[in-house]
UniProtKB/Swiss-Prot annotation:
This is Replication restart protein DnaT. Involved in the restart of stalled replication forks, which reloads the replicative helicase on sites other than the origin of replication. Can function in multiple replication restart pathways. Displaces ssDNA from a PriB-ssDNA complex. Probably forms a spiral filament on ssDNA. Belongs to the DnaT family. It holds the Pfam family DnaT. It comes from the Bacteria. The keyword DNA-binding applies. Residues 151-179 are annotated as: Disordered. Homotrimer. Interacts with PriB. Interacts with PriC. Component of the replication restart primosome. Primosome assembly occurs via a 'hand-off' mechanism. PriA binds to replication forks, subsequently PriB then DnaT bind; DnaT then displaces ssDNA to generate the helicase loading substrate. The N-terminus (residues 1-41) is not required to bind ssDNA or for homotrimer formation. A slightly longer N-terminus (residues 1-83) is required for trimerization and to interact with DnaT. The C-terminus (residues 84-179) binds ssDNA.
């Protein structure tokens, strides 16, 4: 167990080697910090102080309440490794970004408020399949993040308009226009 103990009693290593019993007896809390080369080397404790600290550690290790929580809520399933091609590769039809893509995009400075939609991913894959360029998996993800960011910003954050919808005429006449 590595820890730091607060004490107001300290000694140099040489002094401690010569009179360790007297220094420990003189300390009020049973603890002496021993320094070597102006840095704490170790702590010397009386048996009573050691027993106090061990009892305190045991008390802190016990649960504070008798409520037992179901461990299934704290066990995260191990992520199954996705087969990502090693090195550079050309874009292929079944390519998927990593499961934590949004977090990675945020690390790259691209904040995506929503996950990539299947339509956005399909458009990206189709474009880069036709290009035939090769990049590493991380580079493809960075390109996807930038592509999604740019396409979402071009619409002002609005979803793309359905080109197949039939528009209805507006019968409202704005103020200042004759009707």
């Amino acid at each position: 167990m590595s820890s730091r103990i607060l004490t107001s009693h300290f000694s140099g290593l040489e002094e401690f080697l010569q009179q360790h019993a007297a220094l420990l007896a003189k300390s009020t809390d049973g603890t002496v910090a021993v320094f070597a080369n102006n840095a704490p080397a170790f702590y010397a404790l009386t048996p009573a102080r050691l027993a106090q600290l061990l009892e305190l550690e045991a008390r802190l290790a016990r649960p504070g309440s008798d409520i037992a929580l179901d461990p299934q809520f704290f066990e995260e399933p191990a992520a199954a490794p996705v087969a990502v091609p090693m090195g550079k590769f050309a874009m292929y039809a079944g390519w998927q970004p990593d499961a934590d893509f949004q977090r990675l995009a945020a690390l790259w400075g691209i904040a995506l408020s929503q996950p990539v939609t299947p339509e956005e991913l399909a458009a990206f894959v189709a474009y880069w399949q036709a290009e035939g360029k090769v990049f590493h998996h991380v580079q493809w993800q960075q390109k996807l993040a930038r592509s999604v960011q740019i396409s979402r910003a071009s619409n002002g954050g609005q979803p793309k308009r359905d080109v197949n919808s039939v528009s209805e005429p507006d019968s409202h006449i704005p103020r200042g226009f004759r009707g």
